[in-house]
Amino acid sequence: MSNNKIIESLAILYLNNYINDNDIYSLSLINREFHINIIKDDYFYSTINKNYLFLYIKIFKLLSIKVKLNPNWINIINNNNNINNNNNNNNNNNNNNNNNNNNKIKLIKNNFSVISERLNFLIQCKFNLHRYLDNNDLFITILRGEKLSTLDRIICFSIIYSQDQILLFLLNFILSNINCNNNNNNNNNNNNNNNNNNISNISNSNRLLANNSYNIQFNQQIPTQNELINLNKCLQFSTSTTTTTTTTMVPPFNENILKVYPIYFAIVKVIGGGSLVRFLLSILPNVYNITNVNCKLPITNRSALFYSTTREMTLLLLQLGCNIHDMDYKGMLPIHYHSLNGHVDVVKCLIDDSTINALDQSNNTPLNLASLSGNLSLAKILLNSGARLSIDNLNGRYPIHNACVNGNIDLIRYFLELYSKMNSTTLLPSTTTTTTTTTTTMTTTTTTAITTTTATTIQNNSNNLTNSNSSSVGGLRISNGGNTQQQSIQIPDKENNTPIDLLVLNNHFTIAIELLKYEGYIVGKEEFNFKTARKIGAGAFGDVYLVEWRNKNVAVKRVKIEKILESGKSYQWIRDKFILEAVLMVKLSNFSSFVKLYATCIEEKELLLVLEFCDNGSLYTILNTIPIGGAGANNNNNNNNNNDIIQSLPSINTLSLNIANGMNYLHSLKPQIIHRDLTSQNILIDRNGIAKIADFGISRFKNDIGDKTMTSIGNPRFRSPEVTKGQKYSEKVDVFGFGMILYEMFTRRVPFHDYEQIAASFKIANAERPPLPQTIDHRWSNLIQICWDQNPNNRPSFDQILTIIQNLPIANIPKFLVPLQQNQNQIQNQNQNQNQNNGKLDLSTSSSSITNLNNAVTAKLSLSTSGGLFSGDSDYTVGTCSGYDIGYDNDGDIIDYSSDQNDSDLYD
């Protein structure tokens, strides 16, 4: 015999009280396999639960059968009571009759005790009924935590699990109690006639479907009303002693204790639901009146129409008087609910002019919700019926946004086709040039936006593409592609997430390529000739080339696919990580604090990023190509160009503001973007001296769970101590890197320049910091020290840093190496900040706002998603080469690819 059979046998013995809990426990200790099956796998208790359910059904059947076999129990019991009351007076005269009655009573009581015993057992194990219901998804969805009586629960159970016999038994029992209660209020002589007339009226006048199967079963298979009344009184009698002088009265049964939930489960039933609904309405019209406002679910306020899942049921409910404009607790109409759940046939029945573009409390239309469910056929039906694409919800999301959350590629392609027709079949609205400049947020360079002044429509779709005058849209922008009439769908929502951002945030990478194509960012590899291109940067898994493309110089980042495949990664993994970085660069391309992405190539054997070429190279190159010595040292020709660049650069204030402004924007996004490799190698300087943040190859967004642990990525010299220690990290790792960049700009040295990189990272992890020159103003020193504080919680945010820098004195990058000598006060101040981990920067002198920033520094950003190319779960990075100046090989050593004397000051 298998273990499962043995366990089932034990369960039966347990149910019949042959063994108890101690026996089961002892057996589990003796036999390890029993321990696994009984305790660990819970098979024993699940078997008991299953047997309880079968027993539940069996007892109900037994009750019904017993009542049928003993229809005159109540008369015999009452006679027995009368005999007991008059026993002393009539003992001699009725001795023989009394003996006969006593025998009958004894037999009846024996039979009744069996029923009573099983009923008590049924009540004791009713928690198993609750367990079955509470684990049922449909029951949980409709109930929403509402408390139900056991009677309501049994009715719901009978409907959900199609236990028709139990359901009919219960309904007859309910009717018997209701009419029994009515009889107590009427004349006893007319009680039975009135009762029968009432039931006849309920069954005939209000019955919606005659001779259906439920009514036939109801009348034929279940005990009569008198039998049920007798059963009820017998149950009550069992609680009395045999010497009771009068039979205990049955407590009045009030139908108001019943709730509306059972009929909702009948409505949801796909097979036989219509007949069951009609039956319930005919039997208990006062309880299950679906047109009554009290019939709405108490918590969700949803009417019966919300839970219809078929066309037939929907038409039945509409015929019965259900209102299509009934709102639930979220302000949703039934059409909203069914659009969200993809019930196409139901939505067809609910569409009219008043519902097609109706808004719920979140300003979602049925089309918004259908797009979120990714139902293409439903979206087409709604659009052909007059639904509009141009209505956004309170989160600023249009149907295209929700479609990208779902990731249905066919639906997204359909929307893209509609957007393209918007401009190819109609006149474009007039355009206005707008420029926005603020003091605390970054502003875009002057861009052209389409401002809608009148509604435009597509003739083929019945006004379904009417542009909205909502200010949240700001007009749909022209796409980046070659077709200037192509309508861009890079529309940010209230959290600055565009449709393509939502795709990558929900891991729909393949579909993201479709949107990149639509926006004109995808190009073919045949446009680039790497044989004639000059390599200007390299790393372990990627190279950067200077290429002439479409009549301009660009930097092309080329991923070494074969090299990465050798490390064990799949092409899909490589491509997905690459798309993350490309999408991030697309969003940052309009803003001066970030390197612009012109195009990308995503093919099986080629992954390319076509980037803006920054003439002055990286900040690292500028700071580290210097003459060795102090002021007045002889400058050779190798450094003349570099000195010219340094002299032409803006102050450290402006450069640091530019960097901090961009990082502040990244950290303010939802989800938050963490660069994770903020070093001077990844800060590029264009010909105008504007600092641009580059290389988002290992950036990542912070999810809702919280801080993440991070593998040792990036340059060890700029790596925060929590990263080196493998601890949880936050956006404060970028603040640490920013502090190291400030140190490098003031000293023209990398942190711990006289140590190997790994040794430098260990010194940082041990709370050591490179010495600060005494020539640095103490206010700048304080900022650097608080940024690289050992405790991440003590580091300021970039928003605070922006305010601080506005109040610092002007400082410039020195022409030569600065002696690293410190006075005693600076050492003590630094030790206090690093070792006590309680340093707090004094912001009392900071101004309340930042004003009159350089236009190159204040650029308004519109990024909403992260990069993440070869992110923290990988053991390598392409990152350091995308600054296309120098890279790090596998050992982290600097690789010099300079071959042209004139370019040595630009790309090392």
From Swiss-Prot:
Positions of region (Disordered):
461-491
Q: Which UniProt keywords apply?
A: ANK repeat, ATP-binding, Kinase, Membrane, Nucleotide-binding, Repeat, Serine/threonine-protein kinase, Transferase, Transmembrane, Transmembrane helix
Q: Which reaction does it catalyse?
A: L-seryl-[protein] + ATP = O-phospho-L-seryl-[protein] + ADP + H(+); L-threonyl-[protein] + ATP = O-phospho-L-threonyl-[protein] + ADP + H(+)
Stated membrane topology is: Single-pass type I membrane protein
Gene Ontology CC annotations of this record = cytoplasm; membrane
Please name the GO terms that the record assigns under molecular function: ATP binding; protein kinase activity; protein serine kinase activity; protein serine/threonine kinase activity
| UniProt xrefs under CDD domains | STKc_MAP3K-like (cd13999)
Q: Which is one Pfam family of this protein?
A: Ank_2
Identify the residues that the record assigns to the Protein kinase domain, covering every copy: 530-817
Question: Keyword Transmembrane: yes or no?
Answer: yes
Superkingdom, natural source: Eukaryota
Spans traversing the lipid bilayer: 154-174
Q: So what family is this one in?
A: Belongs to the protein kinase superfamily. TKL Ser/Thr protein kinase family.
Name of the protein: Probable serine/threonine-protein kinase DDB_G0278521
Organism lineage string:
Eukaryota, Amoebozoa, Evosea, Eumycetozoa, Dictyostelia
